[in-house]
Amino acid sequence: MISKALISLLTIALSLASTAQQQVTIPIETKDNVLVLQTDADNRLSTIYFGGKLKDSLEYAQIARGYRTDDNNTGISNNAYTPAGTWNLMEPALQVIHGDGNTSTELKYTAHETTRIDANVQLTTVTLKDPVYPFEVKLFYKTYAAENILEQWTEIRHQEKKRVVLKKYASANLYLTGRKFFLTHFAGGWAREMQPEETELSSGIKTLDTKLGARADLFQPPSFYVSMDRPASETEGKVLMGTLAWTGNYKFDFEKDPYGHLRLITGINPFASDYSLDAATTFKTPSFITTLSENGKGEASRNLHSWARKYRLRDGNGRRLTLLNNWEATYFDFDETKLVGLFKGAKDLGVDLFLLDDGWFANKYPRNHDSAGLGDWQENRAKLPHGIGYLVKEATAAGIGFGIWVEPEMVNPKSELYEKHRDWVLRQPERPEHYYRNQLVLDLVNPEVQDFVFGILDTLLTKNPKLAYIKWDCNAVIYDAHSIYLSRKKLPQTHIYVEYVRGLYKVLERVRQKYPAIPMMLCSGGGGRVDYEALKYFTEYWPSDNTDPLERVFIQWNNSYFFPSIASCNHVTNSGNQPLKYKIDVAMMGKPGFDIVVGHLPAEDLAFARQSLKTYDSISNLVWHGDLFRLIDPHENNIASLLYASQDKSRAVMFNYLTNFRTLLAPIIDPVRLNGLDPARNYAIREINRYPGNTGGGLSEKVTYSGDYLMRVGVNPVVTAKRSSVILLIEEVK
């Protein structure tokens, strides 16, 4: 006779077996794509598919059956968030030391929920728990359906008796099936940002990372794309674009598993960043943003641009201001009279505002060069006896706005701030200081320093409510990473790289809460700090200190893979020996500005520049809010050609630039095929922004073309050494 106890045990066993066999399939869909997660018999969560959406969602559950792998490896390679320390032999997404010293973590699926935020946005939250420890990971998947964007992040939390040490804590752990993968990333340095490199990924791990702290993107931005099966073109091929929304150290691991598939682990760089997490405290990772296209790089870029303008970039659907910067006109050598004299040039040029750059502050150690004054944000009385308010007033009287440059995260050793608050500086004890551009980085981990940095902006904007623009610079990396504040609080120094960035965000959040509307440029010694978390607070970014227009064609082209043109600050300067028209036309790829001595321009050049800004105003909505189509790649051809089309397909503007000045004759023989038009409509084409006296390219404004013709056959913009830049306006004829 079977005892009641045995019956009870059998019932429990059968119940557990039944639960284990209840496979959970979680499809996370956008308009065209889907990421499918699925549990196995042990409730481990895997990624079983990332690709085009199926018509019948019930079929997602069958996908995993089509793959055959070694039973000993099943679920390791494609784990949705791979923990370290147990049966995993691959690169982990999560590595933990538990409160009792145990270095292993197991994560099992326990629940998920999907919340519809609005008609386009949906959030899926998946909860994973360790079966032994009170340790929990939540995976967040936010989808933007129309834009085909997937945003991922992770939250880690525990209820253990002692602190848990997080040694690695990725934002995302993706899995791509295939046989060949081609990674394109962007290397470089100061004045040579965004240089593309394409590599076919082989067995093992390819890592992209930075350890620079501030100005973290100096050598490499946190953005890439992976082509599957073959290198993608603008219009063909399967490609995944990804970018991490984090203004600090990052690490991307691309690992081909034993089956030839690709594991992708992205997030904060764990280098020198073990994080001690208290019980009942949540650690949130930054967002990893991806888009998947089966129609080439162009579609993927347009997905990101559309999403950024609508959901991430500050005032992404608004307007932008053109400006004149004083830097190349004066450098540090200016005074009140000289600056006011430049206002007339700004007005004559027709820009919206005048931007005062570096050198306006500090008294005991005047900011007359780059080795003194940073940190002392009072107007220099010798240069500006009547203060910033006087300049704002005079600019307003001249009919232009007034903006100002700051670098609030930094300090020169030769400053009053350094003398009073050496404890506010990141520096190693008992060791000599190391300087980058003669400066050190303030300890934004410290709330007092956060208050100080916020106060710089708050004081300027409170005293001068008509200030029209802020340029926020960041010229140094973090050397000697040590926080006196962390030591005083008895917190690990390994928190410094994470908490510095969080401190920066706290300051920016306060600035935007109080001053939501002021335009702000994100700058970091050029393009050393461009990401989608920082751009929540900034309306635009500075791509590079290299303003040679030929180099800028390439830098701006490569930034366009990830960031919309409305955010790109492109200035006309004295750099480069190309004609003024070429420089202005290149600047029109985004938001143009000027860094010149207007009074030194010949009368005909000034008249052309003024007219160019009026021309730009007539096409600015196309550039800012249109769909970008890259037509001819300058890395592979003698010209660059790109087009912005209105979303209703009624207008487009096409920019063409000569990029090989060794070519004396027409470098382009064949017509350029356009994109973004309606094949059933008719269009007229005319050349705009022509320099007076220059001959046209032979296109008749009286001829109409079907969109079908323009996209299948094309037109020749006739770019030559004498016509080194050509802008064509395409308008529907009704």
What are these regions (language model features)?
Residues 412, 418-451, 498-600:
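Glycan-recognition surfaces
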Residues 1-23:
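Bacterial Sec-dependent N-terminal signal peptides
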Residues 75, 85-107, 236-249, 291-313, ...:
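Glycine-rich, aromatic-flanked loop segments that form ligand/cofactor-binding clefts
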